[in-house]
Structures are given as C-alpha cells and as structure tokens.
Amino acid sequence: MAAAWLVVLLTVHRLLHLSGVSAVDRSQFPPDFLFGTSSSAYQVEGGYLEGNKGLSNWDVFTHKQGTIEDGSNGDTANDHYHRYMEDIELMHSLGVNSYRFSISWARILPKGRFGDVNPDGVAFYNALIDGLVQKGIQPFVTICHYDIPHELDERYGGWLSPEIQKDFSYFAEVCFKLFGDRIKFWTTFNQPNLSIKFSYMDGFYSPGRCSEPFGKCALGNSSIEPYVAGHNIILSHANAVSVYRNKYQGKQGGQIGIALSITWYEPFRNTTIDLLAVKRALSFGASWFLDPILLGDYPTEMREVLGQSLPKFTSKQKNRLQSTKLDFIGLNHYTTCYVKDCIFSPCEIDPVNADARVFSLYERDGVPIGKATGAPFFHDVPRGMEEAVTYYKQRYNNTPTYITENGYSQASNSNMTAKDFTNDTGRITYIQGYLISLASAIRKGADVRGYFVWSLLDDFEWNFGYTLRFGLYHVHYKTLKRTPKLSVDWYRKFLTGSLLRRKFRDESQLHKFNSY
C-alpha cells in the first residue's frame, strides 16, 4: 500500500505542478462542513422482493427488454440490503461524517397510501440509520430518488397525475414520523430536472415515455408530459415541506431542501445568440424547479419558449410555494459543456437540452472542453464548480447549499477485473480539482456547507446498468466483494488533513519525481 500511495502522491504532485494549481486541504473548509458519499436505494440495495417490499417503477422498467444498456437490473445491485453494516464500516474507515442515501418508497409503502406501512421496510431503515449514528455519521436522506411504487403508475399514471401529490405528502410524513428524530437533513427529490426529461421526453428512464422527434416510444408526448410531471413534483415538494414545517421541524430540529442537477454551460461562440443559449440552458435546468420554489414562478425563458405547454400555478399554489421555501439547496455537479443556439441555427436533437432550443458540445475547434471520463457526457472541467456555485449563489440570495453529488466515472465491461479499476488516479485528479474550485467559491462568500462524492460503491447506473463505475470502492458483481480503489486512501488522507503533507524521506524519490 505504501508503494501504491507513493504513486498516487507523485501523480497528484505532477498534475498540480503542470497545472499551476495549489493543493486542496481539509483546513480550507469550515470545521462543521459535511464530507460524505452519496447513493440511492434502487442503485445499491437489491433485495427487490425481500422484506415484503412492493414492486417499484424501476423494478418493472428494468425487466423490460431493451431498456438497460447491458440488459441488467437492480434486483441484487450491491446487496446493501443485507450488507449495510459492512458498508457502514467502509464509511467509518474512510472518515466521512455524513452519508446521503434514499428511502425506497415501495419498501415502506408497497401500495402507496392505498396500503399499509411495511414494518420490515421500517426495520431496515431504522437499522441503517441507527448504525450510521452509532458511528458518528450524519444521515442525509432523500425521500424520492427516481423510484416510486409501481402501484401508483398503474393506478393513475404516476407523476402525470395530480393524485401523486397526495401520495408523496403521505409518504414524506410517514418518513418524518418514523425516522425524523435522527434525521437532520431531508431532500424531497433528487435532480428531477434531469430525471423527468429522461423519463418523459427521451424515454431513457422509467416509465419510458416519449414522442418523435425526441424518441420512438410506444406512448408519450415529449412536448407536454415532462412539464406536467415537473409541475406535480414541484407541488409535491411544497406540500411535503409544509407538512414538515407545521408538524415536525420544531420538535425534530432538522432541515429540508431539494437536490437538482447543475451542468455548467459556456457559449460555443462568443456571440449574442450563444450567450442567450447559455441563459436558456440554465433556465431549463435547475431553475426550472428552483425558480418556482424560491421565486414563485417558472423562469421567463421557459414561458417564452414553451408557451401554453408550461403549466401555470394558481394563486393558492403560489402562496403555498412562497410560504414553504426550503432551508437549503442540493446541487449535483459533474461537468461543464458548451452550448450553441438552436433557435436561429439548425441543430440535431439534444437529449437533455432540446427543449431549451440549444445543443451541447464537448469540444471547440478540435479542443476538448476537458479530459474525457468513462461517461461520454461527463468531462473533467473543475472551473465549472466555482462558476455554477457562484451563479446559484447570486440567483438565489446565497441560500445555504450542499454539493450533494460530484464524481468520476470509469467505463466498465464484463471482461475487466478489479485491477483495471483500483488504480483510479483519474478520479483522484477529478475530485482534487473540483474541491479546489469549490474551496475558491467558498472563500468568495458562497454559503456551501457540505460535499458528497458520488459514490461510495460502484453501483447500478440507471439506463447504463453496470457499464459505468463511479465508486470509491470497486464491487465485483458476482461475489459482491468490495475492494478499495486508490481514491479511498486519497479521500481518507484529505479528510484527516494529512494529504500532501507527507514528506519524501528519500531525496532521490523527489529527484525522480521532478524528472518524471
């Protein structure tokens, strides 16, 4: 391990020397700053029919042919349902002080509000939460991370029906009542601004609805359904916050927010139309949800482009939104890209930003915007972290913020072994760069209070299945063995404040490094 760490140290020193940036250290962040890892129920738990759990929308979707790139599913995933104590020990040895996870709606309420609370599901999450607390790890809980009971899709169409607002409020209150005495941080939803587009515009995610030219699905309307679903999520969020504020927050002392996906955008060309394209891309991104929640209505750019396709809030709904403002914003940031205008210029269909009438690009004049990662749509562009955090700081009056996801992907296939993944210097460089950028934003006044690496373990990555690996720990999916990657040692040393403070005892090693 000592030799391996020396390789990491030399690599990071070299990269910093070449880039001219300073090393990042734990002392550059506030003492009470949360540092953790993130996950979600469907991606790690497995046990999909155990403990009287009901079917979720993702249980059904992944069993349909052609929905997942490698034909896989989350039936077993990382088997966190049975191995959660082992995973808590990994977190404890890593040195994190928080763990962000989600609660499986179908494990707690197999039939939504149309059935009983499942005591086996409650027992599992009580055991997980208690295990974390005993190790000094703060639970940071997402109420809904994509998965909903299949019953609700079957009964009334899931997020396309206003009925789901009642179900989500009921589920949220069950969670507050059962777990809120130990949970100090709640997020209602995880990045619905991204998942809704993939679910109802492109058809990549459950329930797989879309229409041409966005995709060729059996059912759906890509021009209308994403905004209907998004509207119901915003109102569901407001209702859940209202329940928490009025009945639980005073005695439980927690906070509640929402997590959104935030890609940072730069103009492809420094022209008026591409600068406007950046503005539209941002408005159709996190601001699609944050503007109504914090400012009372949808962004002007969305209304101008979508017209009557964008639902309207009633006066009563606006009052509810204004009276239930969140305590913090969660930002999931992975990458930066260029965008060009598609209103005055011909474009291909962009799977994420077509509704904003922009097209995303990852190189300009043959030069990549940043180093590619294992995910084709994520590039390593650290400056985007500071730019994005600063933008949302200014737009939303410096609302307290947590970086709820940030991570690096390695491409994977069945012929690769653990050794192909454990020497993950690319991940170390990525996290280091983004933390440097985040620390700069904090020094300039951004009220950021936590950072979570995605993810603790390699896991099921939605429509990509197991072809992408984001974990600090490698998971062998046949044996489920967890193996630390080099980034584990890096993150541990960062958290203990010893990163890059180790001195070379052998001056010849330093000479060798300088000539590397």
Curated annotation (Swiss-Prot):
InterPro entries (UniProt xref): Glyco_hydro_1, Glyco_hydro_1_N_CS, Glycoside_hydrolase_SF
GO biological process: carbohydrate metabolic process
Molecular function terms from GO: beta-D-fucosidase activity; beta-galactosidase activity; beta-glucosidase activity
Catalytic-site annotation from UniProt: 405
Glycosylation sites: 193, 221, 270, 415, 423
Residue sites binding a beta-D-glucoside per the record: 43, 145, 190-191, 334, 405, 454, 461-462, 470
Keyword annotations: Disulfide bond, Glycoprotein, Hydrolase, Signal
Signal peptide: 1-23
Record-annotated disulphide pairs: 210-217, 342-347
Entries under PROSITE patterns matching the protein: GLYCOSYL_HYDROL_F1_2
Pfam families reported for this sequence: Glyco_hydro_1
SUPFAM superfamilies noted in UniProt: (Trans)glycosidases
Tissue: Expressed in flowers and endosperm.
Family in the record: Belongs to the glycosyl hydrolase 1 family.
PANTHER family (UniProt xref): GLYCOSYL HYDROLASE, INACTIVE BETA-GLUCOSIDASE 14-RELATED
Protein name: Probable inactive beta-glucosidase 14
